């Protein structure tokens, strides 16, 4: 069983840097981004000219091999990541992380959580075409092959990242939903989901969870599995309001 988590917009460059390494597919993407003008980057990212200028310089550093890379799990610092246990890992927990947890990226594809990557702004909502393809289509075969090679995958992804997979293989992912029971109504929003995904993955790492049945036994921060609302590949966890 493998676990997929998305990248995040917030980053924190305070860990030991490493030399960068790009796959051939990532290098093609980097070359394309370097060929864009500041005006094109401004439109693609939907940012100001000043930010576009900064991003162009970053892409030039990446292409020239001058950008520093950081372990992905520690580089990202979004809400979900801040709820994942990343410090003071035991030997067993770190080994589990290295083998079981992967990060989905618009620049790198699907990578081990501890792989060093360079800070970048690219995501699947960035409006660029690589060889005439959107970023989602550019990476689709790579993402699909990961599912074909790993028959049991738990998705802790947002819809933006799940949409990269072809529909047939997307339906093979084990997905999780985290809802709060507020006065008899089940509710969810991005803050609830992001916090819960991070805290859930922490439990997975600590408990060395390896099967769907073991996933169902996890309870954390008031959330617990609800069999009556779940389906074989869609697991629902509810937090009861006080």
Curated annotation (Swiss-Prot):
It comes from Streptococcus mutans serotype c (strain ATCC 700610 / UA159). Pfam families: H2O2_YaaD (PF03883). GO terms for biological process: response to hydroperoxide. This is UPF0246 protein SMU_2070. GO terms for cellular component: cytosol. InterPro entries: YaaA. Belongs to the UPF0246 family. It comes from the Bacteria.
């Amino acid at each position: 069983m493998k676990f997929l988590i998305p990248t995040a917009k917030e980053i924190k460059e305070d860990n030991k840097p490493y030399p960068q390494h790009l796959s051939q597919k990532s290098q093609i993407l980097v070359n394309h981004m370097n060929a864009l003008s500041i005006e094109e980057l401004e439109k693609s990212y939907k940012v100001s000219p000043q930010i576009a200028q900064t991003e162009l310089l970053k892409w030039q550093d990446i292409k020239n091999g001058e950008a520093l890379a950081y372990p992905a799990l520690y580089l990202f610092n979004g809400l979900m990541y801040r709820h994942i246990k990343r410090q003071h890992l035991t030997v067993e927990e770190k080994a589990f992380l290295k083998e079981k947890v992967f990060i989905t990226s618009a620049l790198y594809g699907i990578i081990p959580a501890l792989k060093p990557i360079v800070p970048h702004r690219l995501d699947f909502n960035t409006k660029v075409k690589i060889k005439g393809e959107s970023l989602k289509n550019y990476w689709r075969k790579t993402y699909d092959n990961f599912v074909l090679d790993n028959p049991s995958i738990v998705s802790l992804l947002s819809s933006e990242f799940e949409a990269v997979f072809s529909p047939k293989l997307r339906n093979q992912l084990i997905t999780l939903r985290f809802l709060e029971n507020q006065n008899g109504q089940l509710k969810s929003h991005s803050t609830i989901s992001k916090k819960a995904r991070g805290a859930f993955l922490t439990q997975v790492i600590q408990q060395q969870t390896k099967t769907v049945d073991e996933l169902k036994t996890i309870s954390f921060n008031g959330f617990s599995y609800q069999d009556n609302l779940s389906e074989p590949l869609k697991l629902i966890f509810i937090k009861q309001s006080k």
